A protein has these predicted regions:
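Extended, histidine- and acidic-residue-enriched regions that form the cofactor-binding/catalytic faces
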Residues: 5-9, 14-15, 181-197
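Generic structural signal for hydrophobic
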Residues: 95, 156, 183-184
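N-terminal glycine-rich phosphate/adenylate-binding segment common to multiple enzyme folds
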Residues: 75-124, 190-195
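Structural motif
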Residues: 43, 86, 170-182
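Conserved mixed alpha/beta catalytic, RNA-binding, or beta-rich assembly cores of soluble enzyme
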Residues: 102-111, 115-174, 178
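Short active-site oxyanion
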Residues: 2-3, 99-101, 137-140, 189-192
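N-terminal glycine-rich anion-binding loop in soluble enzyme alpha/beta folds
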Residues: 1-79, 143-173
Length: 197
Protein backbone atom coordinates (compact mmCIF):
# COMPACT_ATOMS: atom_id res chain seq x y z
CA UNK A 1 0.00 0.00 0.00
CA UNK A 2 1.27 3.47 -0.90
CA UNK A 3 1.36 6.05 1.90
CA UNK A 4 1.00 9.76 1.33
CA UNK A 5 1.09 12.51 3.91
CA UNK A 6 -1.42 15.31 4.36
CA UNK A 7 -0.75 18.29 6.63
CA UNK A 8 -3.61 20.47 7.79
CA UNK A 9 -2.76 23.72 9.51
CA UNK A 10 -5.64 22.97 11.88
CA UNK A 11 -6.28 19.67 13.64
CA UNK A 12 -6.50 16.20 12.18
CA UNK A 13 -8.36 14.20 11.17
CA UNK A 14 -9.90 16.38 8.44
CA UNK A 15 -13.18 14.52 8.09
CA UNK A 16 -14.44 17.29 5.79
CA UNK A 17 -11.69 16.81 3.16
CA UNK A 18 -9.75 13.55 3.41
CA UNK A 19 -12.65 11.10 2.82
CA UNK A 20 -13.25 12.71 -0.60
CA UNK A 21 -9.54 12.51 -1.37
CA UNK A 22 -9.56 8.85 -0.35
CA UNK A 23 -12.40 8.08 -2.77
CA UNK A 24 -10.41 9.61 -5.63
CA UNK A 25 -7.12 7.93 -4.70
CA UNK A 26 -8.67 4.52 -4.08
CA UNK A 27 -8.09 1.75 -1.55
CA UNK A 28 -4.42 1.17 -2.43
CA UNK A 29 -3.40 4.55 -0.98
CA UNK A 30 -3.22 5.33 2.73
CA UNK A 31 -3.49 9.01 3.64
CA UNK A 32 -1.52 9.70 6.81
CA UNK A 33 -2.78 12.93 8.37
CA UNK A 34 -0.95 15.37 10.63
CA UNK A 35 -2.43 18.54 12.07
CA UNK A 36 -0.23 21.50 12.95
CA UNK A 37 -2.44 22.14 15.99
CA UNK A 38 -2.67 18.48 17.09
CA UNK A 39 -1.81 18.11 20.76
CA UNK A 40 -1.88 21.84 21.51
CA UNK A 41 -3.93 23.21 24.38
CA UNK A 42 -6.59 25.89 23.78
CA UNK A 43 -4.18 28.43 25.27
CA UNK A 44 -1.37 27.38 22.93
CA UNK A 45 -3.73 27.64 19.95
CA UNK A 46 -4.90 31.10 21.08
CA UNK A 47 -1.27 32.25 21.20
CA UNK A 48 -1.03 31.60 17.43
CA UNK A 49 -3.75 34.16 16.66
CA UNK A 50 -2.84 37.19 14.55
CA UNK A 51 -1.32 40.05 16.49
CA UNK A 52 -2.37 43.67 16.12
CA UNK A 53 -5.58 45.24 14.98
CA UNK A 54 -6.43 42.83 12.19
CA UNK A 55 -5.03 45.08 9.43
CA UNK A 56 -3.94 42.73 6.65
CA UNK A 57 -1.74 45.45 5.10
CA UNK A 58 0.34 45.66 8.28
CA UNK A 59 0.73 41.88 8.35
CA UNK A 60 1.58 41.79 4.64
CA UNK A 61 4.34 44.35 5.13
CA UNK A 62 5.61 42.31 8.07
CA UNK A 63 5.40 39.23 5.86
CA UNK A 64 3.02 37.14 7.94
CA UNK A 65 -0.39 36.45 6.41
CA UNK A 66 -3.38 35.14 8.31
CA UNK A 67 -4.44 31.52 7.80
CA UNK A 68 -7.76 29.98 8.81
CA UNK A 69 -8.35 26.32 9.57
CA UNK A 70 -10.71 23.85 11.14
CA UNK A 71 -10.39 22.27 14.55
CA UNK A 72 -11.38 18.69 15.32
CA UNK A 73 -14.66 19.81 16.92
CA UNK A 74 -15.74 21.63 13.74
CA UNK A 75 -14.95 25.13 15.00
CA UNK A 76 -12.28 27.27 13.36
CA UNK A 77 -9.33 29.48 14.25
CA UNK A 78 -7.24 32.20 12.64
CA UNK A 79 -3.48 31.98 12.92
CA UNK A 80 -0.53 34.13 11.96
CA UNK A 81 1.46 32.17 9.38
CA UNK A 82 4.83 33.12 10.85
CA UNK A 83 3.87 31.60 14.20
CA UNK A 84 2.98 28.17 12.77
CA UNK A 85 5.96 27.62 10.43
CA UNK A 86 8.07 25.76 13.04
CA UNK A 87 5.07 23.53 13.78
CA UNK A 88 4.67 22.77 10.06
CA UNK A 89 8.32 21.67 9.93
CA UNK A 90 7.72 19.28 12.84
CA UNK A 91 4.74 17.73 11.03
CA UNK A 92 6.84 17.31 7.87
CA UNK A 93 9.41 15.38 9.91
CA UNK A 94 6.67 13.31 11.57
CA UNK A 95 5.24 12.28 8.19
CA UNK A 96 8.67 11.54 6.72
CA UNK A 97 9.32 9.23 9.67
CA UNK A 98 5.97 7.54 8.94
CA UNK A 99 7.31 6.56 5.52
CA UNK A 100 5.13 8.66 3.22
CA UNK A 101 6.08 9.03 -0.47
CA UNK A 102 5.12 12.70 -0.64
CA UNK A 103 3.36 15.32 1.47
CA UNK A 104 0.42 17.49 0.46
CA UNK A 105 -0.30 20.71 2.34
CA UNK A 106 -4.07 20.96 2.90
CA UNK A 107 -3.92 24.75 2.70
CA UNK A 108 -3.85 27.11 -0.27
CA UNK A 109 -1.80 29.71 1.58
CA UNK A 110 1.47 30.89 0.05
CA UNK A 111 4.21 29.37 2.20
CA UNK A 112 7.95 30.08 2.19
CA UNK A 113 10.04 27.54 0.33
CA UNK A 114 12.58 26.87 3.07
CA UNK A 115 11.05 23.78 4.66
CA UNK A 116 13.44 20.86 4.94
CA UNK A 117 11.81 17.81 3.40
CA UNK A 118 13.26 14.56 2.02
CA UNK A 119 10.13 13.73 -0.02
CA UNK A 120 8.22 15.91 -2.50
CA UNK A 121 6.21 18.61 -0.71
CA UNK A 122 3.18 19.81 -2.69
CA UNK A 123 1.66 23.25 -2.16
CA UNK A 124 -1.82 23.63 -3.74
CA UNK A 125 -1.32 27.39 -4.11
CA UNK A 126 1.34 26.85 -6.78
CA UNK A 127 -0.91 24.49 -8.70
CA UNK A 128 -3.91 26.82 -8.46
CA UNK A 129 -2.02 29.94 -9.60
CA UNK A 130 -0.84 28.02 -12.68
CA UNK A 131 -4.03 26.12 -13.51
CA UNK A 132 -6.95 28.44 -12.72
CA UNK A 133 -6.00 31.28 -15.14
CA UNK A 134 -5.85 28.66 -17.91
CA UNK A 135 -9.44 27.63 -17.16
CA UNK A 136 -11.07 31.06 -17.00
CA UNK A 137 -10.41 34.77 -17.44
CA UNK A 138 -12.95 35.99 -14.86
CA UNK A 139 -12.30 34.38 -11.50
CA UNK A 140 -14.19 34.49 -8.21
CA UNK A 141 -11.99 34.05 -5.15
CA UNK A 142 -13.59 33.08 -1.86
CA UNK A 143 -11.53 33.65 1.26
CA UNK A 144 -12.71 32.85 4.81
CA UNK A 145 -11.59 35.98 6.65
CA UNK A 146 -11.94 39.69 5.82
CA UNK A 147 -8.30 40.32 6.72
CA UNK A 148 -7.33 38.08 3.77
CA UNK A 149 -9.20 40.13 1.12
CA UNK A 150 -6.39 42.56 0.25
CA UNK A 151 -3.79 39.79 0.00
CA UNK A 152 -6.09 37.69 -2.20
CA UNK A 153 -6.82 40.63 -4.53
CA UNK A 154 -3.10 41.37 -4.87
CA UNK A 155 -1.98 37.77 -5.39
CA UNK A 156 -4.76 36.66 -7.75
CA UNK A 157 -4.75 39.98 -9.60
CA UNK A 158 -1.18 39.20 -10.65
CA UNK A 159 -2.22 35.97 -12.43
CA UNK A 160 -5.79 36.54 -13.64
CA UNK A 161 -7.52 38.97 -16.03
CA UNK A 162 -10.47 39.85 -13.79
CA UNK A 163 -10.80 38.94 -10.12
CA UNK A 164 -13.71 39.28 -7.71
CA UNK A 165 -12.75 38.52 -4.12
CA UNK A 166 -15.39 37.84 -1.48
CA UNK A 167 -15.21 36.78 2.14
CA UNK A 168 -17.29 33.97 3.63
CA UNK A 169 -16.21 31.65 6.39
CA UNK A 170 -17.34 28.09 5.52
CA UNK A 171 -17.15 27.10 9.16
CA UNK A 172 -19.63 29.82 10.21
CA UNK A 173 -22.72 28.91 8.17
CA UNK A 174 -24.10 29.19 4.64
CA UNK A 175 -25.41 32.79 4.54
CA UNK A 176 -22.04 34.32 3.66
CA UNK A 177 -21.43 31.65 1.02
CA UNK A 178 -24.75 32.45 -0.69
CA UNK A 179 -23.99 36.19 -0.74
CA UNK A 180 -20.55 35.53 -2.23
CA UNK A 181 -22.04 33.26 -4.90
CA UNK A 182 -24.50 36.01 -5.87
CA UNK A 183 -21.64 38.51 -6.17
CA UNK A 184 -19.66 36.12 -8.38
CA UNK A 185 -22.66 35.67 -10.70
CA UNK A 186 -23.20 39.44 -10.82
CA UNK A 187 -19.53 40.03 -11.75
CA UNK A 188 -19.53 37.26 -14.37
CA UNK A 189 -17.05 34.95 -12.67
CA UNK A 190 -16.49 31.84 -14.77
CA UNK A 191 -14.93 29.82 -11.97
CA UNK A 192 -14.81 30.04 -8.17
CA UNK A 193 -11.70 29.22 -6.14
CA UNK A 194 -11.93 28.45 -2.43
CA UNK A 195 -8.72 30.12 -1.31
CA UNK A 196 -7.32 29.34 2.14
CA UNK A 197 -10.09 26.90 3.05
Amino acid sequence: MKRIGAITIGQSPRVDVVPEMQQILGPDVEIVQAGVLDGLSPEEIAALAPAGNGDSEIRRLRGSPVLVSRLRDGSWVSMEEEKILPLVQKKIEQLENAGVRFILMLCTGKFPENFVCRVPLIFPQKLLYSLVPQLAGRIGILTPEASQLADSRRQWGAVAQQVTVCCANPYAGAAGLAAAAEQFVKDGAEICVLDCF
